[in-house]
Every structure is written in C-alpha cells, then in structure tokens.
Amino acid sequence: MAEEDGLRAINPNLAVNPKLAETAQADQIDTVLEALDPDRGRPEEVVTSRNVSLGFGAKTVISGVDIAFRRGTITALIGPTGSGKSTFLRTVNRMNDKVAGFRHEGDITFDDQSIWSSHHDLLTLRRRIGMLFQRPNPFPMSIRDNVVAGVKAHRIAKGKQLDVVAEQRLREVGLWEAVKDRLGDSPFRLSGGQQQLLCLARALAVGPEVLLLDEPTSALDPISTEYIEALLATLVPALTLIIVTHNLAQARRVSHNTMFFYDGELIEHGETTQLFENPQHADTERYVSGRIG
C-alpha cells in the first residue's frame, strides 16, 4: 500500500517542466553534453556485435553473436535463465571487464569504434552507455546528491547548475513532486519503485545515448512496473534502450525488436510482433508459447 501511495504522488504526465527546460542554465548543461559528444546521433546502428563469443574461464556463455541495434529503438533480450543474455548486456558497456576469468572474442562497436579500443576510455563509455540494474542501487548519500553524482564526476555542471540538473531529471522521471521537500533525505527512505526511478534519474543526468536495463522491474510491484514501462516509452527516440527481461508480456509491450537467446546462442531476432506471432525457429516458438522456460 505504501508503494502505491508513493507512486500516486508522482506526476503521471512523465514530462519535463517546460519552464525549467527553457532556463538558461538547462541550455548551458545541454550545450556541455553536446560538446562532450560531437558525434551523437549519427549512425543508424549505434551498437553492433560482430561474431561475439563471451565466457568466464573455460566456460563459454555466448557464441557467435551477430546483431546490430538501431538508434532510437527499444530491443528486448529474452530467453531462459542461463542463456547468456545478461552476460551479453553487461559486456556492451564493459561491466564484465573486472569479473574473474572474463574473456571475449569478436568485437562490439559503439558508433563504429570498438568498445575495447583506445577511442573509448572506460569512464566516458559508461557515461554514454548507461545502465539500470535489477534491484535499485541508490548511493549512500542524499536524494539530490544521488542524481548529480555522475554529473559532478564528469564535470558536466557545478554549483547551482547541479540543482537545476537534479530538478530537471527528477521531473523527467516523475519523481520531483514526491521528493522536492526532502532532497537532503536518505534515498533508502523511498519505496522500492521510487528508488528505481531515482536510479534512472541518476543514469539520465549524464546524458547517455544508450541505456542498458537488466530486468529493471523484476523486483518491483505491478504498479511500479507499469509506471516504469510507460516512462521508458518516453525516452525513445532520444535514447536507444536494450532491456533484458524474463517477462514475455513486458517484452511484447515495451520493445520494437526482440532477440531470443537459448543455450548460449542468439537463435532468432526481429521485429517484436513478428517474432512472437510468427517465430521462424522451433525453439523460439516453444519459448514464447511457454513450453520451455
């Protein structure tokens, strides 16, 4: 009940305050973000995987994945537990780099440059390709400081501009009205759904081009899930979203395209409605019909 009450306090319009967006400070921040990424928005295929195989030690998790993600779309990665979809997702912004025994073959490119090349330093890559995890992970700092943590780290804004960023992004995710009078409070006093929205605001604050989502609503109640799904739809085409989900109904609701992984291989991919209603591979049909899972 507390979760429902908390989310009812959120602005249902899912829109940035027009007056705020028109302020000079907000314009300055957008200018800084554009200056950091002069190549933003050019290639149609923003992320491309070429014959990618991934593993840990002697165990191969993913084999021979060839796929391209179109800019400004939502792609769902589906498949049984252990099929490799989360490993693939976490490799796109190199979250697996520090995992013991991680190895990769083939290449993943972002804006036509290998994510492992010197063209992409790791800090900048993870700013441009953000991530939202399965469980909310707010930092042990105030609500306001959570939103602007990355902005400060990347020196995108400073001083009073940070307050503008915090308000702008909290409004964007619809959380501002619920927290505007307690920005100095601990985020751990928020409901689970509100914490996930805070983490989304934090990810958006640094101006990513791609957002990776690893089962972002699996730990949330249905009301929070519905709200976040609606919010994700407002983020495209400005962003490219790649979402791992075990919820097939969610994949159908939110995505333009779907990739089906099974036993470490990309079995089938295509337009979401087509894949669910007219799958071309027997394993895909068995999975989307619920006969394997």
Predicted regions and their residues:
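The feature captures the beta-strand-to-loop junction immediately N-terminal to the Walker
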Residues: 78-80
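ABC ATPase NBD coupling module
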Residues: 101-104, 114-130, 153, 275-279
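Conserved ABC ATPase "signature" region
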Residues: 107-114, 159-181
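Conserved signature/switch motifs of ABC ATPase nucleotide-binding domains
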Residues: 206, 237
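Catalytic Walker B motif of ABC-type/P-loop ATPase nucleotide-binding domains
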Residues: 211-214
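ABC ATPase "signature
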Residues: 269-270
